[in-house]
Amino acid sequence: MQAISKVSSAASFFRCSRKLVSQPCVRPCVRQLHVRKGLVSGVMKLFSSPLRTLRDAGKSVRISRFCSVSNVSSSLQIELVPCLTDNYAYILHDEDTGTVGVVDPSEAVPVMDALQKNSRNLTYILNTHHHYDHTGGNLELKDRYGAKVIGSAADRDRIPGIDVALKDADKWMFAGHEVHIMETPGHTRGHISFYFPGARAIFTGDTLFSLSCGKLFEGTPEQMLASLQRIIALPDDTSVYCGHEYTLSNSKFALSIEPTNEVLQSYAAYVAELRDKKLPTIPTTMKMEKACNPFLRTENTDIRRALGIPETADEAEALGIIRRAKDNFKA
């Protein structure tokens, strides 16, 4: 499998389906991930090939090329839109119907610029949770395009402009694509994730990050553990689209408590390379997270030993200790 060097992410262990072509930037720049027809073309060369670490990878995301990623049969396109300092919004475009949605628009202008560039309207706004850095663009986008806001029924009073309130196990349709609603509390009480089984993609907001999980602002370790366990039960080739570009700092923490994990070592080096090139590390894959994310591996003896977690501690207790260690970690 050929490695991708110019345009990549943590999911770029999947072969690009066509040659990369330079494109003009959208403010601040946009990467378009086309989830087109085809089967998974390969899984993580990273597992067998060491990659060199590059320095100074914490700069803002700037993406000037587009890359098509073969996944499963689907007409859904997913476009990554950097917002604020380290947030990602995601534009969803169904090729068959032209329907467009956006997940977690923290601000309106970058989303409007991306839509205008492709002469597209906006039909839906999907929010994973109520925090302003995920809903800040709701009202302006709704006012301009007449888009309907989709969110958690538990956060009905906290999501600006909400029109459709969904609860756990609901199935909502986006232009013929079935969307499974998963309640994933922990970061907030009303957090939900949007799972598109036909595209093997999940939007996890601030519940699951690459190599980490969200801070426990409103929930408990028990809630976060249950949420993460639900998410990792999805197929290994599921692409994970989270709310922030935190992977570089997360990798440093993960290595500090599990320095002998060779898969993590290679992935951390690859992440550093991407950030040095000002490229996103998102999407990641479920398989990679299961192998490297300490919050998904709370029973691991090396992690427990590094943090002094008692053998008698259950997984929720261990997750709470790991979360507190991450909160206090200085790279």
From Swiss-Prot:
Domain of life (superkingdom): Eukaryota
Cofactor requirement: Fe(2+); Zn(2+); Fe(3+)
Residues holding substrate: H244, E245, Y246
Extent of the transit peptide: 1-68
Ranges annotated as spanning the membrane: none
Binding locations of Fe cation: D133, H134, D206, H244
UniProt EC number: 3.1.2.6
Disulfide bonds: none
Biological process according to GO: methylglyoxal catabolic process to D-lactate via S-lactoyl-glutathione
GO cellular component, one term: chloroplast
Residues spanning the signal sequence: none
Annotated Zn(2+) binding sites: H129, H131, H187, D206
Gene Ontology MF annotations: hydroxyacylglutathione hydrolase activity; metal ion binding
Keywords from the UniProt entry: Chloroplast, Hydrolase, Iron, Metal-binding, Plastid, Transit peptide, Zinc
InterPro entries: Clx_II_MBL, Glyoxalase_II_hydrolase, HAGH_C, Hydroxyacylglutathione_Hdrlase, Metallo-B-lactamas, RibonucZ/Hydroxyglut_hydro
Pfam families with a match to the protein in the record: HAGH_C, Lactamase_B
Subcellular location field: Plastid, Chloroplast
Catalytic activity: an S-(2-hydroxyacyl)glutathione + H2O = a 2-hydroxy carboxylate + glutathione + H(+)
Pathway: Secondary metabolite metabolism; methylglyoxal degradation; (R)-lactate from methylglyoxal: step 2/2
Cofactor note: Binds 1 Fe(2+) or Fe(3+) and 1 Zn(2+) ion per subunit. Electron spin resonance indicates the presence of a mixture of protein molecules that contain either Fe(2+) or Zn(2+).
Function as written in the Swiss-Prot or TrEMBL entry: Thiolesterase that catalyzes the hydrolysis of S-D-lactoyl-glutathione to form glutathione and D-lactic acid.
Sequence similarity: Belongs to the metallo-beta-lactamase superfamily. Glyoxalase II family.
Subunit structure: Homodimer.
PANTHER family: HYDROXYACYLGLUTATHIONE HYDROLASE, HYDROXYACYLGLUTATHIONE HYDROLASE GLOB
UniProt protein name: Probable hydroxyacylglutathione hydrolase 2, chloroplastic
Organism, scientific name: Arabidopsis thaliana (Mouse-ear cress)
